[in-house]
């Protein structure tokens, strides 16, 4: 590449020589050998910068003239006066080309030519230097040799290659590290986990991974709640299996610790209507909450007392304080379940079993305190310890009679407290269970109440049984398909944005298929979605009848409808399926063009979306462009309708033998009498009047 540039630069010198020869033959004869010498020397010498020499010095010292016209050994630094002189020279040359010549001295011409050559050499020299440096830089990047000479780029080179000095130094440092360093960089484990697994912030309401983590924390919490009383009272923890219990406890503690250090400080929260996702703010919010204090209290290491008192599960009783995660898991799980009442029933049953479990443990502790088998009231030591105590707890809390009478004062006080707490707790749980089941069946009860009121109303006014049957069928089908009788009332309390989101998910795919609304404003389509009403028709119901005034347009959401016609009005002309539209002509027509042209009957159960004319006009007031587009489409539909109605249907049979009669001329109709024949007397009278007037 550099060789080709050198050849190209050498081709410039003869042009300069010819210019100088025109201006001064003697000067050209002196400069040509020096230029050749300068080129030969420049190939041997390295690149360097020199300051420009003046015209007088170049003629006083002939040896220095080689550096004056050299392409490699000259870097200009002209004065502002020289630039002004060059500008004036170019203007004079332009005026010379236009034909206006001015007298110029010989010395001025030689000086101008020298300045032009200096500027040309300066730019070409700078270009060659930059190309060499760029080539060396690319070569170093490709080869990546250890002893490759480094190229020091100047500020002009950095600007020309669009590489800042800071970026170039960073790239050189990186290449140096890649070449000479063989040790891989170590990433801390904490930073690795933060990048690969844990996000900076967690949305507790939408993140399912966080829900799974809460499930794991809930399992650890239930392990402590259910098994700590058993280990504390029953002789199930022995020196043989003590290590297994300790290992399980350590695993639960690790789960607690990870939840406090890694998960909870990343939970997003809302402050002033804004969702906070900053890491420092999230940590500060968690550390200032009551939840953090309870979590820290639940993880205090009281197990160090094992050294003084031995392994006793009582020192792990503080693990039960982490109840906030348990209730948070229940809340999030109920919010995503389709039938949350099922989980509520299971959870309430779990509460009841846990209370019975605690009562069984307390009864065994009281029996052990009094002495196993010492009286009839205490546990006699036969059979499975836990099952016998649990059975006694069930009979006590549910207040089932037939229990042995307490003998000692301790037994009497214990039984009194047990009965009192049992009645209170059991009645509370039964009431909560009733509320859960009642909330689960509230909609069904509402539907049944509505049906009872409607049937009572129809019986009051002696409505025929056929109509009552159809009403019952409509109510049952609507409830079974939608689980609600009126969808509009359900969404009234929601904001408009949420109503639009729900409507988009349900009906947008249907509206998008309608050819009538294609090309309309998207916001207008959104407004239409909010105004659509869903209506269910039974099999055989007339959606609209021929000749009635049309005020609604219908979009089929589910099911099919049939368009009837023919002489008797019972012939099925076409069957419309989901996504089809009918009634749009009556909705968009003006004047008397809004009459229904056919009967439309539901074929099976059909769910139709209806849009009335008044609502559409209110919407189109805000969208004039869409209104014009719909009016054009309405005209096209009306014209197509007119063509179809004006078309003469083909006659069956040999129609060519009996062609249709031509229409009677209008003038002839005037002269026809009541009998349909021409009145000759009237014709004669008219002829006489014309002759008398002439």
Curated annotation (Swiss-Prot):
Bias type Polar residues, positions: 26-40, 153-168
What is the superkingdom listed in this entry's lineage? Eukaryota
Look up and give the organism this protein is from: Mus musculus (Mouse)
Keyword Zinc-finger assigned to the entry: answer is no
Its biological purpose is as follows: Pore-forming subunit of the cone cyclic nucleotide-gated channel. Mediates cone photoresponses at bright light converting transient changes in intracellular cGMP levels into electrical signals. In the dark, cGMP levels are high and keep the channel open enabling a steady inward current carried by Na(+) and Ca(2+) ions that leads to membrane depolarization and neurotransmitter release from synaptic terminals.
What keywords are annotated for this sequence in UniProt?
Answer: Cell membrane, cGMP, cGMP-binding, Ion channel, Ion transport, Ligand-gated ion channel, Membrane, Nucleotide-binding, Sensory transduction, Transmembrane, Transmembrane helix, Transport, Vision
Q: How does it assemble?
A: Forms heterotetrameric channels composed of CNGA3 and CNGB3 subunits with 3:1 stoichiometry.
**Where is 3',5'-cyclic GMP bound in this sequence?**
583-584, 596-597
Q: Which reaction does it catalyse?
A: Ca(2+)(in) = Ca(2+)(out); Na(+)(in) = Na(+)(out); K(+)(in) = K(+)(out); NH4(+)(in) = NH4(+)(out)
Q: What are its GO biological-process terms?
A: visual perception
Q: Does the keyword Chaperone apply?
A: no
Q: What protein am I looking at? A: Cyclic nucleotide-gated channel beta-3
Q: How does it sit in the membrane?
A: Multi-pass membrane protein
């Amino acid at each position: 590449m550099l060789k080709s540039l050198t050849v190209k630069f050498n081709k410039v010198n003869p042009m300069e020589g010819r210019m100088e020869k025109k201006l001064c033959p003697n000067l050209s004869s002196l400069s040509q050998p020096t230029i050749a010498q300068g080129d030969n020397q420049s190939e041997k010498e390295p690149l360097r910068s020199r300051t420009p020499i003046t015209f007088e010095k170049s003629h006083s010292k002939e040896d220095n003239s080689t550096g004056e016209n050299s392409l490699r050994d000259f870097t200009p630094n002209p004065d502002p006066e020289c630039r002004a002189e060059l500008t004036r020279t170019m203007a004079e040359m332009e005026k010379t080309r236009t034909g206006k010549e001015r007298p110029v001295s010989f010395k001025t011409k030689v000086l101008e030519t020298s300045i032009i050559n200096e500027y040309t050499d300066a730019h070409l020299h700078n270009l060659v230097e930059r190309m060499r440096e760029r080539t060396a830089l690319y070569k170093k990047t490709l080869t990546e040799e250890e002893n490759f000479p480094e190229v020091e780029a100047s500020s002009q080179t950095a600007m020309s290659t669009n590489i800042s000095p800071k970026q170039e130094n960073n790239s050189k440092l990186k290449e140096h590290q890649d070449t000479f360093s063989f040790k891989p960089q170590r990433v801390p484990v904490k930073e690795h986990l933060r990048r690969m697994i844990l996000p900076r912030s967690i949305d507790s309401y939408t993140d399912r991974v966080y829900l799974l983590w809460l499930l794991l924390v809930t399992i650890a919490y239930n392990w402590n709640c259910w098994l700590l009383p058993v280990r504390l009272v029953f002789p199930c923890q022995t020196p043989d299996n003590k290590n297994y219990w300790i290992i399980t406890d350590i695993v639960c503690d690790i789960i607690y610790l990870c939840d406090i250090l890694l998960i909870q400080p990343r939970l997003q929260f809302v402050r002033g209507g804004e969702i906070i996702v900053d890491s420092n703010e999230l940590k500060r919010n968690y550390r200032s909450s009551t939840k953090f204090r309870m979590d820290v209290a639940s993880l205090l290491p009281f197990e160090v007392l094992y050294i003084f008192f031995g392994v006793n599960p009582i020192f792990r009783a503080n693990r039960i304080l982490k109840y906030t995660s348990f209730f948070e898991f229940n809340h999030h799980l109920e919010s995503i379940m389709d039938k949350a009442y099922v989980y509520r029933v299971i959870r309430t049953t779990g509460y009841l079993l846990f209370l019975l479990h605690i009562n069984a443990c307390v009864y065994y502790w009281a029996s052990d305190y009094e002495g196993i088998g010492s009286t009839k009231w205490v546990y006699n030591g036969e059979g499975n310890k836990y099952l016998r105590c649990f059975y006694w707890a069930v009979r006590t809390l549910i207040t089932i009679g037939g229990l042995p009478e307490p003998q000692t004062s301790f037994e009497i006080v214990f039984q009194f407290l047990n009965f009192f707490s049992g009645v209170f707790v059991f009645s509370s749980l039964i009431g909560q269970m009733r509320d859960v089941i009642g909330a689960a069946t509230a909609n069904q009860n509402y539907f049944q109440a509505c049906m009872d009121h409607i049937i009572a109303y129809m019986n009051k006014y002696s409505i025929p049984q056929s109509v009552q049957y159809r009403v019952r069928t409509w109510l049952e089908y609507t409830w079974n398909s939608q689980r609600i009788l009126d969808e509009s009332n359900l969404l009234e309390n929601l904001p408009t944005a949420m109503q639009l989101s729900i409507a988009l998910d349900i009906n947008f795919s249907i509206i998008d298929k309608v050819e009538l609304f294609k090309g309309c404003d998207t916001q207008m389509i959104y407004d239409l979605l909010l105004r659509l009403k869903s209506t269910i028709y039974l099999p055989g119901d007339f959606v609209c009848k021929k000749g009635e005034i049309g005020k609604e347009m219908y979009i089929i959401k589910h099911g099919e409808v049939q368009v009837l016609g023919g002489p008797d009005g019972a012939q099925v002309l076409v069957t419309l399926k989901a996504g089809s539209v009918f009634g749009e002509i009556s909705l968009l027509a003006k004047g008397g063009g809004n009459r229904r042209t056919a009967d439309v009957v539901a074929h099976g159960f059909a769910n139709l979306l209806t849009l009335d004319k008044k609502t559409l006009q209110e919407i189109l007031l805000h969208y004039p462009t869409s209104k014009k587009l719909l009016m054009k489409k309405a005209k096209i539909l009306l014209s197509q309708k007119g063509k179809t109605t004006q078309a003469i249907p083909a006659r069956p049979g040999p129609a060519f033998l009996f062609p249709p009669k031509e229409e009677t001329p209008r003038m002839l109709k005037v002269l026809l009498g009541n009998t349909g024949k021409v009145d000759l007397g009237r014709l004669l009278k008219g002829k006489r009047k014309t002759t008398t007037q002439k």
